[in-house]
Amino acid sequence: MIKDILSDTEERMKKTIEHLRKDLASLRAGRANPAMLEKIMVDYYGQPTPINQLANITVPEARLLVIQPWDKTIIASIEKAIMKSDLGINPSNDGNVIRLVIPQLTEERRKELVKVLRKRAEEARVAVRNIRRDSNELLKSGEKEKLISEDDNKKGMDDIQKETDRHIKEIDSILQGKEKEIMEV
């Protein structure tokens, strides 16, 4: 029972960190990254569809994204979806491809992004702590129902705390790396 709880805890914490990584990848850091476009939906024959399912997205230069739609008739729809998004980038359309030039970030925008980063990292830490709490409650109920001994409960809680500390440390290192990337001029 304890091993099941521990493996479930670790799995849920890993998913939280993976979610944080994806979330932070979509933040604009002054460099072109196809993940920036993941959340943008394009109206494709009445269906909201992610850009990466409608086009090839390449990064030919550090601050340039090129979107090559497989169906040339949807270029205008893709362009409109990008303009509506909160990316703050104006697409240029030459009829075949859409180019997104990623502008340099201003100092003010960098500081805003760092605030957003810290908020999302804190949300991830809270999620990890909630997972710890849920797992500890499972151990306590197992002890109450005499399914596990008091010693096993204590050892299980210690192991869960170690996992929690390890994952929170990982969240902090992800945050520091992304902060450094954003504050780089």
Curated annotation (Swiss-Prot):
Annotated InterPro entries: Ribosome_recyc_fac (IPR002661), Ribosome_recyc_fac_dom (IPR023584), RRF_sf (IPR036191)
Sequence segments annotated as region (Disordered): 143-163
Alphabetical UniProt keywords: Cytoplasm, Protein biosynthesis
Biological process annotations from GO: translational termination
GO cellular component term, pick one: cytoplasm
Gene Ontology MF, one: ribosomal large subunit binding
Cell compartment(s), UniProt: Cytoplasm
First-listed, main subcellular location of the protein, grouped into a coarse class: cytoplasm
Function per UniProt: Responsible for the release of ribosomes from messenger RNA at the termination of protein biosynthesis. May increase the efficiency of translation by recycling ribosomes from one round of translation to another.
Family to which the UniProt record says this protein belongs: Belongs to the RRF family.
Protein name, UniProt field: Ribosome-recycling factor
Source organism (scientific name): Syntrophomonas wolfei subsp. wolfei (strain DSM 2245B / Goettingen)
Lineage: Bacteria, Bacillati, Bacillota, Clostridia, Eubacteriales
